[in-house]
Regions:
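A structural feature recognizing the 12-helix transmembrane core of secondary solute carriers
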Residues: 1-213
């Protein structure tokens, strides 16, 4: 029998998921280092972050029905896309370091950090928010606060860790950091995925239940 506790089934998973995906906003910490390592201008690499935010919105808009139907599936999609995109970004940074000025490396970073991680961001944001609202239906302000807290804490917690990794990993530290973080965030998000669950017996209202509108 599954544990039915709003903190275990909603709050903790939300923090695990949001503290992971919220690190997308740490881009400014390492964007210049990526640009220098792969042989492009900082302006060229900045598009990766722009694409990530764009696809965050697009995936949230168009994959909302997946979240509504099955948050367990959507949270798994989020974990796979976010961690996979981060690992892929690390690979193309490594490739760009070995082939300075390679357009393939730059496009690979756009796809991995921008598109793949962007999809993980959108689904990863919606999945716990939906669940929080169900578990904390009488305290929606608290539910919203918990969701925002995870995003806000992500950069504050991850920024010094990322900087320490960059300083300690030496040559090629930038791509090594992405590989390490991909593993860490996958574990965090997968645990969140396993814990995340709607209240037992809850079903999405049908059109008839919602009434005319």
């Amino acid at each position: 029998m599954k544990v039915q506790n709003k903190w275990i089934r909603a709050a903790i998973p939300a923090l695990l998921l949001h503290c992971s995906i919220g690190t997308v906003y740490c881009w400014s910490i390492f964007s210049q280092e990526i640009a220098d390592y792969i042989g492009f201008s900082k302006g060229a690499t900045e598009w990766a972050f722009s694409f990530a935010i764009f696809f965050l919105g697009m995936s949230a808009a168009f994959l909302g029905n997946v979240v509504e139907k099955d948050i367990h599936r959507s949270s798994l999609i989020a974990a796979l896309c976010f961690a996979g995109g981060m690992a892929g970004t690390g690979f193309f940074i490594w490739y760009g370091g070995n082939n300075p000025g390679s357009v393939l490396a730059l496009i690979g970073i756009y796809i991995c950090y921008g598109f793949i991680m962007g999809v993980g961001l959108g689904t990863g944001y919606l999945s716990p928010v939906k669940t929080l609202m169900l578990w904390f239906s009488d305290r929606k302000g608290l539910a919203t606060g918990l969701a925002v807290a995870g995003f806000g804490a992500a950069k504050a917690i991850a920024s010094p860790i990322m900087q320490t990794l960059l300083d300690s990993l030496g040559d090629g530290g930038i791509y090594k950091m992405f590989f390490i973080l991909a593993c860490v965030y996958f574990v965090m998000m997968f645990v969140g995925h396993l814990l995340l669950a709607k209240p037992e017996g809850w079903h999405e209202p049908t059109g008839a239940d919602k009434g005319p509108g």
